[in-house]
Amino acid sequence: GATVSQAVPFEEKVDNAAGIVLGKVVDTKSQMDASGRWIVTYSTIRVEKAMKGQAVSEVTVVTPGGRVGTLNQSTIGVPSFHEGDERVVFLKNTRLGPTVLYFDQGAYDVATDSRGERIVEPVQSDAVHMDTQRGVAVANEEPRTLPEFEKAVQAAIKSRPQRVEMSAVAERARQQQQKNGTIADFFARNKVVIAIAAIGAALALWQLTRK
């Protein structure tokens, strides 16, 4: 069956990326990891522009899979890099070094169209991305011109404080709703006890007023 992963909204990818770079792959090298069981590939990208994070001239990203001698390992949903590829990559820091955030959802191909415009679109992937709340497959993001893509990244960065605040407000409302529900449940479960207590209070008040 197909490999299924949770679809990640664009703004969430921007929020969680340690860096976002545009650049060209200038070198790839695959080798066994320290355990000697798994192949990892190191791809060096000459950075043209950092859309988010520290401006660097080069970044080397590590991804699982690759080829060492006659041994080949690959994982569905993990992007591969080849010399000459032009990419936008969302970065995540790991103990092995930077990797691609959300794997195939964090890497984009950059190609030049017939009019000479650079177009950014998600890398091809065999994985199916699902909206887990609605339980439906999500279509890939539409191709965008490079300026449009950069604008979307900057808009997401700029809107983050507002979105965080809105999320906090929604969470407080949810907690209040739960609290109100708990109080209502308490009254529903204990209405006999509450009724007896109310009768007791009324009798006590009646006794006081008689004196």
Regions found by a protein language model. Give the residues of each.
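Transition segments tied to proteolytic processing and entry into folded domains
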Residues: 1-211
